[in-house]
Amino acid sequence: KRLFARMAEVFAGFLSYTDAQIGRILDFLEESGELDNTIIVVISDNGASGEGGPNGSVNETKFFNGYIDTAEEGLKFLDRLGGPQTYNHYPIGWAMAFNTPYKLFKRYASHEGGIADTAIISWPDGISAHGEVRDNYVNVCDITPTVYDLLDITPPATVRGIAQKPLDGVSFKVALENPTAPTGKETQFYTMLGTRGIWHKGWFANTVHAATPAGWSHFDADRWELFHIEADRSQCHDLAAEYPDKLEELKALRDEVKALKRQTATGQAGALAGGAVDGIVVARVDGLD
């Protein structure tokens, strides 16, 4: 208990230090008179990490080499945690707690604990709404289109004669001014190390595939869950048995996008089966099978 509490305390210190550095940037912008004229976006890349293992670690690189630290090892470094002699990481239990009320943690693209993050956006001169909360579903791939939209910039089709790939994502500029305005985003896919998630119009289908050979089986054997995540953000009520058609609808979206990407990769231009799917985001679909 003493070790685990100290590991969380060190992480809290890191967060406080990071917050102070962001404060230095804001102070400079304020002193230079540019704070109100600067678009600021603050996000993190995933939920809290479980890479400390069950006992935490004094050196996170051990985890990536398959070595699980013991509590006894951690206690030897208790007074050095957070210093230059350690690269410590809190235990996996803290990851679960830090992500409350969401399930699981970083690496799980199938659950909100792995993919849900807070986002803070500020631009006093360009956004009339101040200090308000938005509940619109957005993804990190929507940030760049939104910034372009705020600045009335159209991304170039070519750069120095080289054709550019179209941006993934959908601008949510309208939601910054009007919380009830639709952004046009309808679908988002997630995948990481066998875990997969499909968000579509307030519903979320997910499954977990074992990341290591010990638990491998055919992908067709994976058990899918279904949540009405717009009303059940904690993914507590699996509705797969109650709404099997809805589950298959979401899985079909993924299959259609995979087919389209294969056509694109082989130079075969073609529409999605059954016609185009509006508002779909193809980001991070590679490697789903």
Q: Residues of each region from the PLM?
A:
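Beta-strand elements within well-structured catalytic alpha/beta cores of enzymes
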Residues: L15-T18, I22-I25, L29, T38-G47, ...
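Histidine-centered active-site microenvironments of extracellular/periplasmic hydrolases
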Residues: F28-W123
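Loop/turn elements at helix/coil->beta-strand transitions in domains of secreted/extracellular proteins
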Residues: E34-I40, T183-K185, H200-W203, K246
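Glycine- and acidic
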Residues: R2-F11, I127-E132, Q235-C236
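Long, internal low-complexity/basic segments
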Residues: K1-F4, G53, I143, Y148, ...
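C-terminal cap/loop subdomain of S1 sulfatases and analogous C-terminal strand-loop tails that border
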Residues: P84-G113, G126-N136, V140-E225, I229, ...
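Extracytoplasmic/secreted proteins, especially bacterial periplasmic and envelope-associated proteins
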Residues: R6, V10-G13, Y17-R24, A97, ...
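Anion-binding catalytic surfaces of enzymes that hydrolyze or transfer phosphate/sulfate esters
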Residues: K1-T18, L29-N37
